[in-house]
Amino acid sequence: MYDVIVVGAGHAGCEAALAVARGGLHCLLITSDLSAVARMSCNPAIGGVAKGQITREIDALGGEMGKAIDATGIQFRMLNRSKGPAMHSPRAQADKTQYSLYMRRIVEHEPNIDLLQDTVIGVSANSGKFSSVTVRSGRAIQAKAAILACGTFLNGLIHIGMDHFPGGRSTAEPPVEGLTESLASLGFSFGRLKTGTPPRIDSRSVDYTIVTEQPGDVDPVPFSFSSTSVANRNLVSCYLTKTTEKTHDILRTGFDRSPLFTGKVQGVGPRYCPSIEDKISRFPDKSSHHIFLEPEGTDTVEMYVNGFSTSLPEDIQIAGLRSIPGLEEAKMIRPGYAIEYDFFHPWQIRSTMETRPVENLFFAGQINGTSGYEEAAAQGLMAGINAVRKILGKELIVLGRDQAYIGVLIDDLITKETKEPYRMFTSSAEHRLILRHDNADLRLRKIGYDCNLVSSDDLHRTESIIKRVQHCLEVMKTAKVTPAEINTLLMNKGLQELKTPARALSLIKRPGISLQDILEHSLSVRSAAEELCNDPRVAEQVQIEIKYEGYIKREQLVADRIARLDSLHIPDNFNYDSLNSLSSEGREKLLKHRPATIGQASRILGVSPSDVSILMIRLGR
């Protein structure tokens, strides 16, 4: 008998299987196609706004995604550099073929993982506890626990114009049938969602004299805290163009054959990644929409047309593409399409990713109603971590909203009603100034180490950074900068000059003055804080802590108040019907979601502050 079975070898499944295996347990990873491990079915990129933060958190906890993109990325950029550090988000174009091969190689070389190419069509449970999965051949495979990471394969249906046919992730991959019905028989509630992808074009058919080049960063920041650099700095550029009124007119002629507008598609699509026809319909006054041309690798001519997701008929797609500046001669290699699939309402999972209806069964990824490689990988990692800890009888790991974007993601899934594919934004995190990409290891490395996913060397390196940052902050509080050292710089910057020596910390707080300015002009500060000159990581943390000290302290106070509510646990079998004073909607939502804490209860839509107060009184809090 296996310890854990992981169903699906996408981004969630790979992280789940690796977490189980590296946690010391024997894992069986089942996938319908071993050549499609960690396949990038949509955009050829990792990271981006909020997603980059999640990727760095995955790495900090000991996951593989960050290392994979550092090894196979072909262009790296830090987004939102002009904004504050809370908004900085790393993003990389991937060679999607190499990314998949990298992850397959990592999975295959993990001794605690066995691989099986087959399709799971059923799940069995005994007395409410997971017992086995059934594969297409009819064989039942037993394990102590299972993690389902099925992606968009559950009863998948692909739409291109008025044509529709079964498909799991692309037009070449079959759906999974029977598994939804099997889970429904165990008491699970499911729904239907939709996502889509744009056409791919031949990069040789683009007129590069018209489109705007977007090169990568000269000195990119790696995703993994274990990487000192990325393997390939800037092998490719991306390109920017935009649709025109002519494009919109052409696409409108196909609306009568659009599955989106004719009612063929029943699933709800992603609000923040709408199809091009949806954008034209929703924003009729907008004369253009940005289009980003993204290479899919260094050994292919395929180019991803970001911003042009569509399920319109093929003839309309190609005509619309050729009306875009720079794409007048575009050759379409693959059409865009929409895909409908089953998902399971995430109020049925706990904060640990374990399902409520069936013990020792975990869900991760798009089966929970999320979108995005990074969101899926994060769920897979947490499901893998907690499956191991459940089997070993250890305390399960729940990340708070003040600890990680991953904690925000999982909490949102449980407390919010998922009516469309969920994706993460920085605006989703109320504590984003303390959940920056640059400090993910400082926040989460110890947890990864405790889960046997982070080496002692990596942990010691992180602990060393924390100590040195604290030392340097103390130096900045006491070290003095003289007028003779700094006044010329202040005068050149149009800032008030010093009349007496000032603390380095107070000078750095001034707009227009950086930590580097102080180090370059003050020998005494430089001598006292030598680490700042030698380690960019330490210098970065010190500057942020000083510049944003007031904001960080204020945010931490709010986070601490919320954390106190999240520390007040509600028994799993709590009888809400015994509280006559609860509002009817509040009682209904509490019974449905079964929050684990008072804090979680307070975030459920429909649960009022009065309901929360009644709960706290009953629980003696």
UniProtKB/Swiss-Prot annotation:
Record flagged with keyword rRNA-binding: no
Main location group: cytoplasm
UniProt-annotated location(s): Cytoplasm
Biological processes annotated in GO: tRNA methylation; tRNA wobble uridine modification
A family per Pfam: GIDA
GO-annotated molecular function: flavin adenine dinucleotide binding
Protein residues bound to FAD: G8, A9, G10, H11, A12, G13, V120, Q366
Positions that bind NAD(+): 269-283
Domain of life: Bacteria
Keywords, comma-separated and alphabetical: Cytoplasm, FAD, Flavoprotein, NAD, tRNA processing
A GO CC annotation given for this chain: cytosol
InterPro entries: FAD/NAD-bd_sf, GIDA_C_N, MnmG, MnmG-rel, MnmG-rel_CS, MnmG_C, MnmG_C_subdom, MnmG_C_subdom_sf
Cofactors named for this entry: FAD
Family label: Belongs to the MnmG family.
Subunit composition and interactions: Homodimer. Heterotetramer of two MnmE and two MnmG subunits.
Function: NAD-binding protein involved in the addition of a carboxymethylaminomethyl (cmnm) group at the wobble position (U34) of certain tRNAs, forming tRNA-cmnm(5)s(2)U34.
Protein name: tRNA uridine 5-carboxymethylaminomethyl modification enzyme MnmG
The species this protein was found in: Chlorobaculum tepidum (strain ATCC 49652 / DSM 12025 / NBRC 103806 / TLS)
Lineage: Bacteria, Pseudomonadati, Chlorobiota, Chlorobiia, Chlorobiales
